[in-house]
A protein has these predicted regions:
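Catalytic-site signature of metal-activated, phosphate-bearing donor transferases
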Residues: 51-58, 65, 69, 75-216
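Conserved donor nucleotide-binding strand/loop of the catalytic core
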Residues: 35-52, 56, 60
Length: 252
């Protein structure tokens, strides 16, 4: 899915054409773009919701499996081979979790940042588990306006998903400065509309921390921990508690 520029996806198209039977591009901008290649193109108006255009794109798919990638991502040869192996490995699996490795500037400090094997000069990253490889099945679809997910639909349909060793390289965090406030507003809206979803407080906390709203981030993780009492919220809550102290009492 891209906004209004076809160029960023050309490298993705080139990298996957050896294993993909079809390529579908969803364009959410308000103008036509210069297209190239043998891709199916869907123009879909943007309305502050990532799931809806992605689901519209899924309806164009005819292949048995879907590999979903964004314009600020890439997949290397090693992981393409892992994708090829995964789709032929098990008949009882409907989807695979991958590692979305989001690279960051070396001095960036926030929850989840760690050292990773060097890739194109970067060793600082956040690893997020998400489902990007899944069967083309009408029971499997994206939900939520931001940090769109397939987990809920898979679980409702009782379809099995498993972890994989597939890594997708993500460069979007390097250029988040202009978009971070917008993503924060989307995360607030998701938490307001879906307070019952376990991940809503988490993504609000992550988005708030990224733009320096430390107190709001802490309160989001704290609210999630009080509600669910699990490690998913306890660990980032403790991280933000320490970060609050390091601000010498300054509250954002």
């Amino acid at each position: 899915m891209i906004k209004d520029e076809f160029k960023p996806v050309k490298d993705i198209i080139k990298s996957v054409e050896g294993i993909c039977d079809e390529k579908i591009i969803v364009i959410t901008g308000n103008k036509r773009v210069k297209e190239s290649g043998d891709c199916k193109i869907l123009y879909f108006p943007w309305h502050d919701d990532y799931s809806t255009p992605l689901n519209a794109g899924l309806r164009l798919c005819e292949s048995d499996w879907v590999l979903r990638m964004d314009s600020d991502e890439e997949i290397d040869e090693i992981n393409l081979k892992r994708v090829q192996k995964a789709v032929t490995l098990r008949d009882d699996v409907w989807a695979y979790e991958v590692c979305q490795r989001g690279y960051l500037p070396q001095k960036r400090v926030e929850f989840g940042v760690k050292l990773v094997p060097e890739h194109k000069g970067y060793t600082n990253a956040v690893d997020d588990r998400c489902i990007r490889l899944f069967r083309n099945d009408p029971r499997v679809f994206f939900e939520f306006n931001t940090h769109e997910t397939l987990y809920n639909s898979l679980e409702r349909a009782r379809l099995r998903y498993v972890k994989s060793n597939i890594v997708i390289h993500h460069w979007g965090k390097l250029n988040m400065k202009d978009k971070a406030s917008y993503y924060y507003e989307l995360a607030k809206d998701r938490a307001r509309r879906h307070p019952e979803d376990m991940q809503s407080y988490y993504y609000l906390g992550v988005s708030a921390e990224f733009i320096g709203k430390i107190e709001e981030s802490y309160q989001a993780f704290l609210a999630g921990y009080k509600k669910y009492r699990n490690e998913y919220y306890r660990v980032p809550m403790e991280h933000l508690k320490r970060k609050r102290r390091s601000t010498n009492g300054r509250i954002n």
